Amino acid sequence: MLREAAALGFTHAELSHGIRIVLLPGVIRAVEEGIIKISSTHNFCPLPTGITQAAPNLFEPSVPDRREHEQWLRHTKRSIDFAAQVHAKVLVLHLGSVNFFWFNPGRTLKTFVRRHPTVSVPDDKAYRAVLKKACEKLRKRMGPYWEQVKASLEEVRAYAAQRGVALGLENREKFEELPIDDDFPALLDSIAQPHTCGYWHDTGHADIKQSMGMLDHQLHLEKNAARLLGFHLHDVTPDGRDHQPVGSGHINFEMVSGFWRPHHLLTLELSPRVSRDDVIMSKQRIDALIGQRFGG
């Protein structure tokens, strides 16, 4: 896999949340032989023993259950250790979700859209009213989950700092997932020193949230620009499929590229079903934007 990425012209790769333990010897060998460098990894990497497919939300830092929290902490620390071992600069993290047991207001939004296929979402007045009420319910219920997220970060911030691994807190695409997008600046400002935490921006997730009326993609980047560590770059098609080739959807990557800085990590995060030619095309489009942004 890493050899194939190198053959396509990539000098760096992110190790995803789908790396099984049996793959580690080959990964480490590829790094030691200089075939490719690892820029970032994604929690949990490697996967917990016995898990054979991607499972970034297997254990959540928002869950107050002691046993699940201990598993999250154990495997996150192991992921930090592995990131340091392969000289990755950033470990990308999900921060969990709010559990609604019986009634998830996010489903209300989906139901409204399904029952009103001709309305213009997110601008429709009735939709905006449903969205406002749903967001109020999310805020009302999130308190203990949000406090648990902050406590969980407190348990790993110094551990990561000691190992020179930055923690990239990723924006998410589902209604109930944390953080609520407006809360990133306050969260990052509240973390005690020393810490390496920063904001990790996923273009597809932001676009999906924008289509729901929950954020403005450009304004969201402006608010978090000073805290950015890197980007997951992928497009979203008009029917809402993300992790698609750059240029195949409606994301304004020229706008996104305006927020890139030389120290940022840029990762193409494409679906495994994307063809080799589309991977190459996506790389070429990002390379062209890098050239426009930084010259050369």
Where are these regions (language model features)?
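Active-site acidic/histidine proton-transfer and metal-coordination neighborhood
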Residues: 61-198
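Residue-level "edge-of-site" marker
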Residues: 18, 44, 96, 173, ...
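N-terminal pre-domain/capping segments
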Residues: 1-80, 84-88, 107-126, 144, ...
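Histidine-acidic metal/acid-base catalytic patches
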Residues: 1-6, 21, 34, 78-93, ...
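Short, basic/glycine-rich phosphate-binding loops at helix/coil junctions
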Residues: 56, 128-132, 232-237
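Acidic-residue sensor for enzyme active/binding pockets
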Residues: 14, 170, 269
